[in-house]
Amino acid sequence: MKRTFQPSNLVRARRHGFRARMATKGGRLVLNARRAKGRKKLSA
């Protein structure tokens, strides 16, 4: 059986990276929430 997690740094960055977050309104809300919470790392 093929495992569900097949790691790829490129796909990770494209789907969950900073620029992907900034591209949508919802993503910007995510970043704002993480900034407000004081997260050291905002995105992948």
Curated annotation (Swiss-Prot):
The keyword Kinase does not apply. InterPro entries: Ribosomal_bL34 (IPR000271), Ribosomal_bL34_CS (IPR020939). GO terms for cellular component: ribonucleoprotein complex; ribosome. Pfam families: Ribosomal_L34. It comes from the Bacteria. GO terms for molecular function: structural constituent of ribosome. GO terms for biological process: translation. Keywords: Ribonucleoprotein, Ribosomal protein. Gene3D superfamilies: 1.10.287.3980. NCBIfam families: rpmH_bact. PANTHER family: LARGE RIBOSOMAL SUBUNIT PROTEIN BL34M, MITOCHONDRIAL RIBOSOMAL PROTEIN 34 FAMILY MEMBER. Belongs to the bacterial ribosomal protein bL34 family. This is Large ribosomal subunit protein bL34. It comes from Cereibacter sphaeroides (strain ATCC 17023 / DSM 158 / JCM 6121 / CCUG 31486 / LMG 2827 / NBRC 12203 / NCIMB 8253 / ATH 2.4.1.) (Rhodobacter sphaeroides). The gene is rpmH.
